[in-house]
């Protein structure tokens, strides 16, 4: 029924010539209509507050509370812990995020439930903050409606949260508004006071009744900050990237709506590629209207996401010409995330043309449409360059190539610190356990950057003892030795200081496991042996190529992902022959790991996207 409300309201919203949006919302209220009319009557002599009430009621369809015995049981657990109000309110929102708990809850539409007294109280409290807070003196009425007035931020249970501001925070805000000229006229500066208070409510990391709780996690921290900001009279919103275009996952954060500064906070997307940035709003935004039994992806059945990509990125519009089945009314752009194609934007068909607006640059997009619930490829994927030019990636089966691949996921600079720590280490060999007159084998002079380092060794000499020696405590994934026939040799591990940890992991042929070496580590082979090759690998993400792992290469055409065959790696790179050129590729590891990214080939090398 809730989805019905969303589509019905959006459809009616687009037909304002027949009836006003307010009248349509009141029709949906059913038996609750007198309560909402009572609010309008209450403000009949206050035009501004009446406009605010109309805004809330007009956009109320589609907003709802999730409730049920499961959530009430969860609340009893939280109530027994003596958690501060604001933290408790956000903790109670976490089960609403997960399908396994959501399916146990029932939606209660606001339009049928919200009472006059509650709505009047919320409106009066919001206006009190707007008219008495010096930092809001230049806040526009439209921004007030969207970013301060709303009585909810998600699907939480409704209460009188504006009345529950922490007394210490309230006193800090009053002090600043009375005395601190550099703060009291700036929403952003006042928000720093609230931010510090919200951060002080650190719950740590925990798991309550199977629900993960972490104040460091972006969704939790955004909800916590947004409630704290609006409670204190700071206009704010949550912006989010539903899925990254160059890595797995998503992100969301809180933005301050400041009358002087741009309403974005830096440091959220600059180091990543975002196809779209959306803002959670109370008011409804355009969404695809299905015709007959047309399938609409779930993200775009929610009208409360506003496209704000232009606030963050230099964007481009993209027009695609392609024929689709006559019953198809909408097409979509998808990106590769989490080993699947995920929808990020939509367009309505107009004479076999689809126009997508404000798209993020330097991204590979996959145009798709739906037949029933089945996703189909509209045309070939393309690269949207920063200059707005699109480059179609149509596989060329007449020009084939040989690919030598070394990774399945891009190497990020912030993950190679374990390799940096290795610089300065030395490897030595000796037949004396004290390493008197030891033979110098290798110096670590550069960061291996998660790649294995293969060190050839003089096979005419034999040594019983091998030593890793360093001034630092480091973490290694592998330390391997091979004889002149390429066979692995194993010895006894000696930890001179006795402060190492998980040292057996260095010799388990698992690149994802690792051990901590405290300055020195010795391997005793029991007798002098001939070593032809020594290999070491810093702690890493296991996204390289590793001997014994099975890999499969795919390329993308109009029929989807096409396999180019499976291979077992025999070294730290893998070769695939007779590969179509000018395609999007995907290398999968069927043995281990989850992180995988698509790539193209530029100048003979992998370019990850």
What are these model-predicted stretches?
Residues 27, 37-38, 46-213, 248:
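Secondary-structure boundary elements
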Residues 315-326, 406-408:
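A short, amphipathic beta-strand motif
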Residues 339-353, 448, 565-569:
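Short, acidic Ser/Thr/Gly-rich low-complexity loop/linker segments typical of extracellular
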Residues 399-461, 472-533, 537-547, 551, ...:
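Disordered, acidic Ser/Thr/Pro-rich linker "stalks" and the adjacent N-terminal cap
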